[in-house]
Amino acid sequence: MFRGNFETSIDAKGRTSLPAKFREVLVDSFGDERFFMTNSNPVRLGDGGYSSGLVIYPYNEWLALEEKLKVGTGLGLSSAELASVKRRIVAPAVECVADKLGRILVPPHLRKSACLEREILFVGMLNKAEIWSQAEWEKVFRQDIENFPIDSPVLAELGL
């Protein structure tokens, strides 16, 4: 499973290094070094704006998601909502594999949608990982703390 946060940088051409730990997880836990990268679901911020990062799906996890979206039944979505999800998540998706040095290329359309410029953060989310600009991550993380304070019943229910 993907765990932890890893700070790194991305250059002007969109090259960055996939954390070694995440490369290990792809192969050891998911059996494939390939993955898909796409837009994450936007997070609504308290000021009414939105923040968005990218999400990395292990290859087989992505194929399972595509199958659900292809069938479309049982998801509780209207055909318009399903089409919207496909446009936001499936259409911009790219298949990736790190090179021998662990580098990946984040294409321009994904860098733009996630506001990735220089300092970025890889975030482990168990069966997937996220990529955030440092600035956007700080906004989202601050909101998470406000939404789930230390005495939150949600956290207590999870035993945290």
UniProtKB/Swiss-Prot annotation:
Q: Which source organism?
A: Geotalea daltonii (strain DSM 22248 / JCM 15807 / FRC-32) (Geobacter daltonii)
**Where are the annotated coiled coils located?**
none
Subunit structure comment from the entry: Forms oligomers.
Q: Give the matching SUPFAM superfamilies.
A: AbrB/MazE/MraZ-like
Its lineage reads:
Bacteria, Pseudomonadati, Thermodesulfobacteriota, Desulfuromonadia, Geobacterales
Main localisation? cytoplasm
Specify the superkingdom: Bacteria
Query: Residue ranges of the SpoVT-AbrB domain?
Result: 5-50, 93-136
Q: Which Pfam families match?
A: MraZ (PF02381)
What's the name of its gene? mraZ
Q: Name one GO biological process term.
A: negative regulation of DNA-templated transcription initiation
For this protein, the record's Gene3D superfamilies field holds:
Transcriptional regulator MraZ domain
The protein's matches in InterPro entries, at most eight in alphabetical order, are given as:
MraZ, MraZ_C, MraZ_dom, MraZ_N, MraZ_sf, SpoVT-AbrB_dom, SpoVT-AbrB_sf
Protein name per Swiss-Prot or TrEMBL: Transcriptional regulator MraZ
Mind listing the UniProt keywords for this protein, alphabetically?
Cytoplasm, DNA-binding, Repeat, Transcription, Transcription regulation
Q: Name one GO cellular component term.
A: nucleoid
What subcellular compartments does it reside in?
Cytoplasm, Nucleoid
Q: Which family does it belong to?
A: Belongs to the MraZ family.
What are the GO MF terms of this UniProt record? Answer: DNA-binding transcription factor activity; transcription cis-regulatory region binding
